[in-house]
């Protein structure tokens, strides 16, 4: 989970947005973290590079927990 938080904050920082300090498994990528479509695209690229998983391969991912499940099912 710490790596996912790091990646999320890297994406936010790269886009000039404020990093989040509180993220849990139920955090919604758009509503809670503030991601837009460009942030989600960068997140996808970074997670695929680090974990070899396309988190959007089977549809939309909305929460941190859904990302973790995709990585765990690899």
Model-derived regions: residue spans:
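Conserved alpha-helix in the HATPase_c
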Residues: 42
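Phosphopantetheine-dependent thiolation modules in NRPS/PKS and related acyl-activating systems
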Residues: 1-35, 39, 50, 54-74
